[in-house]
Amino acid sequence: MAQQGQQPYVIDPVGSDIHGEAARLRALGPATRTELPGGIEAWSVTSHTLLKQLLTDDRVSKNPREHWPLWQRDEIRGSWLQSWIGVTNMFTAYGADHRRLRKLIAPAFTARRTDAMLPRVEAITTALLDDLAAHPAGEPVDLRARFNHPLPMQVICELFGFPEGEQRAELARLVAAIMDTTATPEQAGATAAAVYALLSGLVADKREHPADDLTSLLVAARDDEGQRMTEQELLDTLLLVIGAGHETTVDLLGNAVHALLTHPEQLKLVLSGEVPWNDVIEETLRWAPSIAALPLRFAVADIEIPDGPTIRKGEAILPAYAAAGRDPAFHGETADGFDIRRDRQEHLAFGHGVHHCLGAPLARMEARIALPALFARFPGLQLAVPAEELEPTGGFISGGLHSLPVRLTSG
C-alpha cells in the first residue's frame, strides 16, 4: 500500500482514546493509511462525505475471498480479524450473494415484528428498573451491567429463541471477546470455536423443536429448497444478527446516559419536554456511535480521492464512524460537541446503502423506551465517578464504555 511519503498511522489496539485518535486521523486527511493490530494496513476513511460515498460505491466490496490479496494468500487466518471478515453472511457478502442473504433475513426485521416487540421491551425495562430501585439508595451501581446490557440481551435472545440461563451469559462473554482487537490467534480461535458450538446447538434445537422465533424462521429458510443458504451461512448470519443486535444497543444506551449526565443543560432540555427523546438518540449515534470503526472493505478497482490519495485495487478500507460522526467539514465548528438541538442530525452509525443495519429500527425502539423510563424513575441519576475515570470497552471497534457507575437518586 503506497501513500506519498507517509508512514501508516498506527491504530491504538486497545482504543484508549477513540475520539482523540479520530481527531488526529481527520487532521491527516479524509482517507489515511493506518496500521491495524497484527500489522494489517488499511485506509481509514474519516470524512463523512467520502465515507457515505464509498459505502454505496460498486468499486468497494466486503468480500475478502474475492477482493483482498492478503486473505487470498492465507495471511489473515487465525487473527482477531477472523470473526469479522472470515464469516459468510450479509456482512461480508458482495453483489448477488449479499442480495440473496439479505432477502432471507429481512423478514426477521419487518416493522410488524419490531412493533410486536414493543410491549415486551416495555415489560423488560420495567422489571430491570424495579430491580435497580431495590438497590441501596445512594450506593454506586454499574448501570451497564444492571440495565444497559441485560435489556437488549434479553430482547435479542427472546427474538431468536435463545434459552435462558448460563448460555446467555456465555453468549455475552463470547461477543465481548470478538470485539477484542488485542486477541492472540489462540484466543481468537478459541472464541470462534466456542461461538460456533453454541450456535450449532441452537440451530439443532430449533430444527427439532421449531417455534415462533427468528432462529426457527432462518432454519426454515435455509432448509427450504427454493431459498437455500449453506449451513455455514446460517451460523454466520445468526452470529451477525444476535451479536450486532445486542452489543450495539448496549453501547447506544450507555453512551446516551453518559452524554446526558455530562451535559446537564442538554438533560434539562429533554426532561422538560423541549426536545424529544428521538433527538437525543440521533445525536448520541452521531456523537458517540456504538461502532467506532468497522473492519473491513476492499477496493475492487482503483479509487481516486479528490484532492487526496488513490486507493488501489485490492487495498483494505476501514470505515471510521466515530471520526466521521464528528467531522467538522460536515457538521460545522461544533461537531465535537453534544447538542440535541443540532439542525443537521445525519449520521452513518448504522451504515448506509445496501449494508445499512436491518436492526436499526429495533435498536432505536429499545432506546426510545429505555431512556425516558430510566430518567423518569431516577430523575436525579448521576455519575458515581468523575467522567474522566470512565474506561472504554477496549479495542478500536467498540465505541462504548466498559462500565457506567451511577448513583440512583430519585430527585
Give residue ranges: language-model regions.
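Cytochrome P450
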Residues: 1-411
